[in-house]
Amino acid sequence: MKVLITGVNGFIGQALFSYLSEQTDYSVFVTSRKFYQAGLRPDEIFFVSDISNSTNWMSILSGVDVVIHLAARAHVLEKDGVNSANQFNSTNVDGTLQLARHALQSGVSRFIFISSIGVNGAETINK
């Protein structure tokens, strides 16, 4: 079974990759913005610099049975300026929808989306 994990450099992604790569029934592939995850072989990594509604996932999803989507923008920072909320939405909403649509079109049989409250942004009340 071919499994694609997005967000492999995060806490859950690292643990999930380690676990699944030890299982003999799985061929595990990952996406990453940057490479630093120890133990990954280059043929297991697809570099995706931007997750948005314009990301083309079709070649990456070829032959994939399961997508486990963990990648997200977890922080909206003041220094990002006026467009930070738009960038946040572009990755976490539009980018996730684009991946799900392409997974459906590619015949992926399972799409597992793991998220947290952090994708809604963190804001201090009465700041």
Regions found by a protein language model. Name each.
Residues 3-23:
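N-terminal Rossmann NAD(P)H-binding glycine-rich loop of SDR-like oxidoreductase domains
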Residues 6, 31, 67-73, 111-117:
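SDR active-site strand-loop-helix element
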Residues 4, 29, 47, 89, ...:
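Conserved Rossmann-like nucleotide-binding pocket used by diverse enzymes
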Residues 36-37, 44-91, 102, 119-122:
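NAD(P)H-binding glycine-rich loop region in Rossmannoid oxidoreductase-like domains
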Residues 94-127:
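Conserved Rossmann-fold NAD(P)-dependent oxidoreductase catalytic core, especially the SDR/UDP-sugar
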Residues 25-34:
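Conserved glycine-rich Rossmann-like NAD(P)H-binding loop of the short-chain dehydrogenase/reductase
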